[in-house]
Amino acid sequence: MELFSIRIQRTFQLVSTIEAYDENDLKCELGTFFPSLQAYVYRAAGEIYAILGEQDKATEFYIKSQYYSIQLKSDFDGVKSGIVYSFRSVSIYSLSDLISNTITVCHPSKMNDPFDSLFLLWSSESNLNRICKNNAHIKPFSDSFQYFKIRSFVGNKKLSLDNNLIRKVVMWSHYADAHKGFCIRYKLSTVFIKQAQGNGYSHKYLKRVHYLSKNEKCDILTKKKDTNSLFIWKSTEWKYENEIRLISYDPSCKDDHLQIPLDKNSMIEAIYFGYRCVESNVKNIMQILGEGVQYFKMDYDPNNVYKLKVNKILYKDYIDT
């Protein structure tokens, strides 16, 4: 008991020191140098508060721990701007992003594959109860994960322009409503690629998905999992996607979806309309975005019908000016 009291005292001394910096808006600068220390201290404080029965306080400190645990995690820190692609069906949700100039992230439970992210399986209360001896901290710790949201894109290793990604028939079939949808080409600034925000302990960053080989196994029975790894490992069956993930952590949003505004240096550069996208949808999207965006229409290649062609189309040919 005496050792536990000493641990409490030392942990709270460190918490007081770190919070003093946080309150003076120095958290991001400090996080650049030793984010692992903040993550560890806040997590220890969360565990202590949970043992003391203060669940709300425990959740508060676990949230702060999550913020620091994902610092310095972007795969593209040296990229000044990056190109990513998003295949979409024509829906109220996809059109809303175009109208509001936002990118919507969602809770991993809303993704099409229930095994899409280790996050859901490992951080569940049932799994944590299975692998942890003490369970006082499990609910607040598990609750701190609910504010993670993700958005999937397609991109190459350098985040550069790549029409080969657009020509993949399977992507149009699976993610663009059987070629009736469209694909957005985004240019994202370095600020959008990785950004920690002020007082709200929110953070977002781009990460490349890694695919496990057929001989590799991925278990959820390990006590310690790097938060980063919970979002980036997928089965090798998905390797064809070339997936890039935008991972967002925002404790201020309790909904399953969050619209993130594009900053002034990020933009929609181009729209690619699917081979079966009807003209009314083409016109509607053009009217939303205007003439400042490039437009293309997918078509089959008569020399190879299993490979798509990218044909440029003009705004003025569809919209009366």
Question: What is the meaning of each model-derived region?
Answer:
Residues R7-R10, L14, F61, Y68:
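Alpha-helical solenoid repeat scaffolds, predominantly canonical TPR units
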Residues Y21-E29, S69:
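Alpha-helical junction/boundary sensor with strong preference for TPR arrays
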Residues A44, E60-T321:
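Partner-binding and oligomerization surfaces adjacent to conserved cores of proteins
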